[in-house]
Swiss-Prot record:
The modification N-acetylmethionine is found at residue 1. It comes from the Viruses. Coiled coil: none annotated. This is Capsid protein. Residues 1-10 have a biased composition (Low complexity). Capsid protein. Probably binds RNA and plays a role in packaging. InterPro entries: Cucumovirus_coat, Cucumovirus_coat_Asu_sf. Residues 1-30 are annotated as: Disordered. The lineage of its organism: Viruses, Riboviria, Orthornavirae, Kitrinoviricota, Alsuviricetes. Keywords: Acetylation, Capsid protein, Ribonucleoprotein, RNA-binding, T=3 icosahedral capsid protein, Viral nucleoprotein, Virion. GO terms for cellular component: ribonucleoprotein complex; T=3 icosahedral viral capsid; viral nucleocapsid. It is found in: Virion. Belongs to the cucumovirus capsid protein family. The keyword Metal-binding does not apply.
Length: 218
């Protein structure tokens, strides 16, 4: 073999080695595959826990259904003694109740703790009789009644509790905007007294879209 053949053979061997090294799996490729598998399993777990019609559950951010919008009601509970109750009907603005036959699909409660919050509260939504004055004895009798879920929200030393929302699906009931006055948000200060500067409640009522005015208010 002459010198030129030896040099050519050496180059071919180096080229084959370089091609082989590029195709060999690296540790970063293996780590990426493991991470992808973990993310896939996490997505399956999260999707399995989404709320259904028959199982209200905690949610993060929900989009309104097509053709629907929402109206929010804000309530700041007064001082509630330990072991006592507070209730307020879901009274929507007149501009919304004017369209009382528009269907309501869902109700969502959002608990917004203020900086001084250091208590434990139980929050729920109940359908209440029109004659009810939402007194403490009346709420006490209604609170444990029925299958409606309850949000237990409590102070956490490491920060606010992550689960601060509860969603109710009313689609099967064919409830409408006019029915909302028959519902009330109820609060139970089970273990601690609740001060007036500890908590704000937001109730989001998802309903069919209503016409909006094109004229600015006077």
């Amino acid at each position: 073999m002459d010198k030129s053949e030896s040099t050519s053979a050496g180059r071919n061997r180096r080229r084959r080695l370089r091609r082989g090294s590029r195709s060999a799996p690296s540790s970063s490729d293996a780590n990426f595959r493991v991470l992808s598998q973990q993310l896939s399993r996490l997505n399956k777990t999260l999707s399995a826990g989404r709320p259904t019609i028959n199982h209200p559950t905690f949610v993060g951010t929900e989009r309104c259904k097509p053709g629907y919008t929402f109206t929010s009601i804000t309530s700041k509970p007064p001082k509630i003694d330990r072991g006592s109750y507070y209730g307020k009907r879901l009274l929507l603005p007149d501009s919304v109740t004017e369209y009382d036959k528009k269907l309501v699909s869902r109700i969502q409660i959002r608990v917004n703790p203020l900086p001084k919050f250091d208590s434990t509260v139980w929050v729920t939504v109940r359908k209440v009789p029109a004659s009810s004055d939402l007194s403490v004895p009346a709420i006490s009798a209604m609170f444990p009644d029925g299958p409606s879920p309850v949000l237990v929200y409590q102070y956490a030393a490491s920060g606010v509790q992550a689960n601060n929302k509860l969603l109710y699906d009313l689609s099967a009931m064919r409830a409408d905007i006019g029915d909302m006055r028959k519902y009330a948000v109820l609060v139970y200060a089970k273990d601690d007294a609740l001060a007036t500067d500890e908590l704000v409640l937001h109730v989001d009522v998802e309903h069919q879209r209503i016409p909006t005015s094109g004229v600015l208010p006077v």
